[in-house]
Design a protein with these regions (language model features):
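Conserved serine/cysteine hydrolase catalytic core
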Residues: 175-236, 241-244
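Conserved acidic catalytic loop of the alpha/beta-hydrolase fold
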Residues: 70-86
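Catalytic histidine-centered segment of alpha/beta-hydrolase-like enzymes
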Residues: 248-261
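A short loop-to-beta-strand scaffold at the N-terminal edge of the catalytic core in hydrolase folds
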Residues: 3-12
Length: 280
């Protein structure tokens, strides 16, 4: 990136094929898209998912600068390396990043946009639950079982894995001998209600200039996206299509990856140029 930060990415497919960029949510990594990226590649898409700065295997910002404008600049840089304008799929924080970047380049950055369980204005109770989890456990975990218990408490509707070894993709062993989440703890800072309102208004004001196709996919059990938030976005983005994934909460791709893939299939067929491809 322009400030020297290196971003880790996973790619499937070949350059020159219909391009798709996938952005994970806050506290997640590119591995949250693992199944979708692999499937897209087998169907002839050039799919790329990368760890946001301060997450996963990507570098941490020295300053630190983790504003949405900074994340949007990173996305713009990645998109500029693709052979053609991509479809951008963003979950939660990734969706907010996509809206900021596309709002700055409403007709040239992306071919289409998919928002995953996010809108400019979200349910404050659901947002607090997410933030409490992301800002909790600052002292880390003694072992994988303790980390798995924390995740199970946050996602009670999802079965607790019998073997928690997969969590190691999201954990790092630090000098204190404890396991800590992979992200830079400076990334998640509490924002005031006034700051969140200014951010929501800024995004909503950008929306009328966005003319590309757009899809919002939300989890039927989500406590983050509300009916009011969806309708407010749709009023500013009239081309917005809306799809629901039954049995999924805020973390749709992790809760129901098969159903999520099915929800985006028709949209990608129409706007990424692969007639007849099915993601299942």
């Amino acid at each position: 990136m322009s400030d020297g930060v290196a971003l880790a990415a996973t790619v499937s497919g070949e350059r020159g094929q219909a391009a798709v960029i996938l952005l994970h949510g806050g506290g997640q990594t590119r591995h949250s898209w693992q199944g979708t990226v692999k499937k897209l590649g087998t169907l002839g898409y050039h799919a790329l998912a990368f760890d946001a700065r301060g997450h996963g295997d990507s570098d941490w910002s020295a300053k630190p600068d983790y504003s949405y404008d900074r994340l949007a600049e990173d996305l713009e840089t990645v998109a500029s390396k693709m052979a053609d304008a991509p479809v951008i799929i963003g979950a939660s924080m990734g969706g907010m990043t996509a809206m900021h970047a596309i709002g700055r380049h409403p007709t040239t950055l992306a071919r289409a946009m998919v928002l995953v369980d996010i809108a400019p204005r979200v349910d404050p109770k659901g947002l607090k639950r997410v933030n409490d989890f992301l800002n909790g456990y600052r002292d880390g975990f003694a072992d994988l079982e303790e980390a798995a218990d924390a995740v199970a408490a946050y996602n009670p509707h999802r079965p607790r894995p019998q073997n928690p070894r997969g969590l190691m993709k999201n954990l790092r062993l630090r000098d204190d001998g404890r396991l800590h989440w992979h992200w830079d703890p400076r990334f998640f800072r509490e924002r005031s209600d006034e700051q969140r309102e200014r951010s929501a208004k800024r995004l909503l004001d950008m929306c009328p200039d966005i003319a590309i196709p757009a899809l919002l996919v939300f989890g039927a059990q989500s406590d983050v996206v509300s009916a009011e938030g969806i309708e407010e976005l749709r009023a500013r983005l009239p081309q917005l299509e809306v799809g629901t994934v039954p049995g999924a909460g805020h973390m749709i791709a992790g809760d129901r990856n098969d159903a999520f893939n099915g929800a985006i299939t028709p949209f990608l067929e129409r706007h990424a140029g692969l007639d007849g491809a099915q993601i299942a």
